[in-house]
Amino acid sequence: DPLSQLSSIAVNLKKINFLRNKKINKQKIKIDTLDNFVKKNKDLFKKKIDFIKIDTEGNDLKVLFGASKTIKKHRPKFIQVEMNYHYLFSGENLYQFAKFLRGYEVYQIMPFNNGLLKINPTRPENNIFHLSNFIFKKKN
């Protein structure tokens, strides 16, 4: 969907070359943390949370910070995040995700059903990507 790339609360969208000439509309929205959402909706979360998928166009790390209590309590087996060009302007990288998610191994989801590639997030070359999805798998 061509509009989904514009669906972001990132403040630096105009710095991204191919978005520079796009019409960007601003809309006020209400946001909340995952921790608050889980707390307000306890009936929905009686069972253990095993999987969290985050795709917030450049704000995934902030979402993780807002899910810290939920992650600590439920220790999901998998947490999936998306890394894309928005991170060039937010100053965030894969290493910061891995540092926050201690006790998890990092895997890049390879395109075209080519499986998972284990990644060492401390290596600089593993923090350079265009569009990638990563799975953080809880260590045993």
Question: Model-found features: residue ranges?
Answer:
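Conserved acidic-Pro-Pro-aromatic motif
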Residues: 37-140
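Glycine-rich adenosyl-binding loop in Rossmann-like folds that engage adenosine-containing cofactors
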Residues: 1-37, 41-44, 132
